[in-house]
Structures are given as C-alpha cells and as structure tokens.
Amino acid sequence: MFKNILVALDGSKHAKRAAAVATDLAQRYEARLQFITVTKKPPARVSEELQRYMEIEQLKGTPDQLVPDVAKNILAEAEKHARDKGVKDVRTISKSGPVARTIVDVAKRQKADVIVMGSRGLGTVEGFLLGSVSHKVVSLAECNVMTVR
C-alpha cells in the first residue's frame, strides 16, 4: 500500500507520534521512510520542548545558530528510532522555506505516497520547524496526508 512515506517533524509531541505511526507503517509495508524538517525564520528564543534536542553548551548561541542543530538532532533521533524498529530504508531531509509549500514540494519530488505529520505543531511563535501547517499541507498535497494526534 505505502512504498514511500514522508514524515514532517518539528520536535512537538504530535510530530513524535506521527514519526512513531509512520515508522510502524514503513516497517509493516517495507517502505522507504523519509523524515523532513523545514526551517523558516527562527523565533527570538528556543522553546523548552526543543531545548531537549540540544547539548547545554549549544544553548549559548542565538536562535539563528541553533535552528540547524535542533533540526539535525530531531532528524537523527527519528532516524535512530526507525532503524531500531527495523526500517531498512530511512532518509533525512532538512530544508528551509515556506513550511507547507516545502513539505508538499518535497513530497511531489520524492514521489511520496503519503505525508504523515502531527495535527498540531509547536504554535506560531515557537513553530519555526513545522508549526501548525497541517491544514495547508492537506489542501496543497497531491498525495494522501495522514495527520496524527
């Protein structure tokens, strides 16, 4: 059913659940699993929820400096979890730009069968990686979109 799954991540609890659901699907269908983070202009501060992805010494930088590292750590954690669960074909993608449009464009370019994402992100101030864009992705995507609560 699914051969190519794209999962949008932002570090929120909904995105973590989406990653878990997508990992189960990828394992069940022996599908390619691609995790993506999309960055846009960072906020003035990094939320506590995202700080857990950073080492203490890294938290001394500005959000402009921290965002790429946060995204990298989110992707690394998701990739490790998927590989630990037995998914063989796992890839990570880090992009910047308009979040919903970038997710949809990558899904189309990668020929994703489904986009899996959390139903809610980190909110308007803190959601610089994914945010609350699931409704935009649903309206723009040509493939199936699964939102996870």
Can you name each region flagged by the protein language model?
Residues I36, R91-K95, M146:
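General small-molecule cofactor/ligand-binding pocket signal
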Residues K72-I115:
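Structural beta-alpha unit
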Residues R101-R149:
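Gly/Ser-rich helix-loop-strand patches that form or flank binding pockets
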Residues M1-F2, R149:
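Absolute protein N-terminus
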Residues E55-A71:
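A short acidic, glycine-rich active-site loop
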Residues K3-E57, K85, V90:
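Small/aliphatic-rich secondary-structure junction motif
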Residues A8, I93, G118:
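Active-site-adjacent beta-strand anchor residues
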